[in-house]
């Protein structure tokens, strides 16, 4: 897969089985709790402010959104955020079922799963569970410790160490969707697109 992102377009949102899953295009799945900056991270990677709608209200996304990168060289797949406290138990359950269906049963050709954490909050139980699911289903994983601009160097290295330990030495990259330079963005894209 190529690393330079020349184009990024919204393809469609799905809530279950769909032909897009079987069209053979490799998928990069972005997963994480509500409010970790998933939409901002994808926007930062494609160098667009508004490809993925960001909202001040976490938990707005309730379907799986597909974005075609470089005319279907791959899809960036934005999964709904999990663990949002203000959702009703029924809504929470249906969102979590949708995420797990996609990761475990949909047979989507997932080339890489990008688990996004709020570096300040570190690894939550939900995130640990997600790491377990991704590993069990052999999805190559990279963890992005987002909102890196919120910590100083000392706090950052302590948090990164704790995240790596909790994730059993997964690849962990610090990042800030709001302040990332071109160089940082390219470095993260390289890791995402590595086989």
List each language-model region with its residue ranges:
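Conserved C-terminal guanine-recognition region of P-loop GTPase G domains, centered on the G4
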Residues: 97-171
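Short, glycine/charged-enriched secondary-structure capping and boundary segments
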Residues: 24-25, 45, 89-92, 128-132, ...
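Hydrophobic aliphatic residues
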Residues: 45-49, 103, 167, 192
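Conserved G1/Walker A P-loop phosphate-binding module
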Residues: 1-86
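Conserved nucleotide-binding/hydrolysis micro-motifs of P-loop NTPases
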Residues: 60, 74, 81-83, 120-122, ...
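Canonical P-loop GTPase G-domain recognition
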Residues: 5-18, 150-195
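Conserved nucleotide-sensing/catalytic segment adjacent to the nucleotide-binding pocket
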Residues: 71-110
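Amphipathic alpha-helical transducer elements in NTP-driven molecular machines
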Residues: 61, 92-96, 100, 124, ...
């Amino acid at each position: 897969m190529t690393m330079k992102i020349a184009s990024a377009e919204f393809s469609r949102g799905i809530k279950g089985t769909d032909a897009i899953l079987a069209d053979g295009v490799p998928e990069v799945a972005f997963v994480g709790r509500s409010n970790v900056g998933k939409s901002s991270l994808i926007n930062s990677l494609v160098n667009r402010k508004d490809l993925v709608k960001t909202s001040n209200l976490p938990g707005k996304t309730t379907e799986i959104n597909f974005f075609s990168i470089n005319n279907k060289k791959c899809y960036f797949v934005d999964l709904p955020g999990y663990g949002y406290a203000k959702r009703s138990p029924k809504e929470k359950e249906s969102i979590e079922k949708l995420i797990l269906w996609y990761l475990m049963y949909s047979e989507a050709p997932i080339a890489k799963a990008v688990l996004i954490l709020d570096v300040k909050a570190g690894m939550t139980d939900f995130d640990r569970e997600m790491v377990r699911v991704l590993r069990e289903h052999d999805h190559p994983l990279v963890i992005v410790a987002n909102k890196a601009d919120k910590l100083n160097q000392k706090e950052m290295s302590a948090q990164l160490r704790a995240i790596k330990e909790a994730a059993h030495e997964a690849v962990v990259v610090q990042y800030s969707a709001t302040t990332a330079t071109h160089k940082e963005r390219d470095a993260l894209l390289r890791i995402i697109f590595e086989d």
